[in-house]
Every structure is written in structure tokens, then in C-alpha cells.
């Protein structure tokens, strides 16, 4: 598989690589509700972005979400030491915890991140595969939900010119490529 595949006339790119190195206006962090960093993508973003991101996340926890960021919601911080100007933090659903709303919550992660991006003048954004790691969301179902949410948003919005879907492993990118709904 190539390192990059285009969808929707180049507005959506499927990329294999490191999300912390993407040259975009904003990257999305598949965060945990504490917003204090963790493993996987969350830890990598906090490590690469430096202490400024953590400081802003702590302030958000203190003033806006003292009980933690709810699943499906999104908040924005500086990009710190990252190439991206912003990091948009969103918490995906933990698979099996809320069966009635899992798909809705996962779609909301993408929708709310894109809305927040538009509000901050973001023209390019990179997403990881939200909830498919430690949160256990099935990758095929997640690919369908993510691609539908992104397609629907871009169909109604021309401000965001490029969305990158960044996968660390080729096998995950292959699943997305096979099951997307663009």
C-alpha cells in the first residue's frame, strides 16, 4: 500500500506515519477523559508537544471539565512543540460500556473536532483512529463511522481543505481503505 491515498478529490488523505509530525494546522488527540496524557497516541502527542499542552489541559480540567472530558466532546489547546498550531483533544467511547450510544459518541468525536477546528480557522487537520486502540472499538465499524462523519461534515463545509487520517501501522490503514464510506 502507498504511504498516502486520496479520497473526495484530495480533501481526505489516508496516511501511514506519525501524527505528531504531520504538517497541518491541527492534530486530533484520542485522549482519555483526564486530559493528562496516557499511552498510545495520547502519550505520544503529550511527549512530542511538551509541557505547554499539559498545562493547558490542566487548566481546562480545573475550569471547564473538573470531572473529566465526556466521550464525544472536544477541546482545543496549543500545539506546543508540535508542527501543528493546535491540538484538539477528544475522548472516544470505550467499546462495550454504552452499547446504545457508542456509534453516536464516536461520530461526535469527529464532528465536534471538525466544528472546533472550523471555529479556530483550521484549514488542515489530522486524525488518528479514535477508540480503536486501548478503548477496543472494532476497526471496521470505526472506519465506517469516521468516514461517514467526515464526509458529511466536508459536504457542508468548504473551510477545511484537508483532512488526514493518520495510521501508525499499514494493517490499520488497509482496514480503513477497505471499509471506508467516502
Where are the regions that the model predicts?
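Macrodomain-like recognition of ADP-ribose-binding/processing modules
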Residues: 1-182
Amino acid at each position: 500500500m502507498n504511504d498516502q491515498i486520496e479520497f473526495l478529490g484530495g480533501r481526505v488523505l489516508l496516511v501511514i506515519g506519525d501524527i505528531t509530525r504531520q504538517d497541518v494546522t491541527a492534530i486530533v488527540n484520542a485522549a482519555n477523559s483526564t486530559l493528562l496524557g496516557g499511552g498510545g497516541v495520547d502519550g505520544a502527542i503529550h511527549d512530542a508537544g511538551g509541557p505547554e499542552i499539559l498545562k493547558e489541559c490542566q487548566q481546562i480540567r480545573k475550569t471547564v471539565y473538573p470531572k473529566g472530558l465526556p466521550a464525544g466532546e472536544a477541546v482545543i489547546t496549543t500545539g506546543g512543540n508540535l508542527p501543528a498550531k493546535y491540538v484538539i483533544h477528544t475522548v472516544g467511547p470505550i467499546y462495550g460500556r454504552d452499547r446504545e450510544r457508542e456509534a453516536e459518541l464516536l461520530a461526535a468525536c469527529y464532528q465536534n473536532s471538525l466544528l472546533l477546528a472550523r471555529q479556530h480557522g483550521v484549514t488542515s487537520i489530522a486524525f488518528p483512529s479514535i477508540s480503536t486502540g486501548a478503548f477496543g472499538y472494532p476497526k471496521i465499524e470505526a472506519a465506517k463511522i469516521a468516514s461517514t462523519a467526515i464526509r458529511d461534515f466536508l459536504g457542508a463545509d468548504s473551510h477545511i481543505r484537508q483532512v488526514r487520517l493518520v495510521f501508525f501501522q499499514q494493517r490499520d490503514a488497509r482496514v480503513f481503505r477497505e471499509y471506508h464510506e467516502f
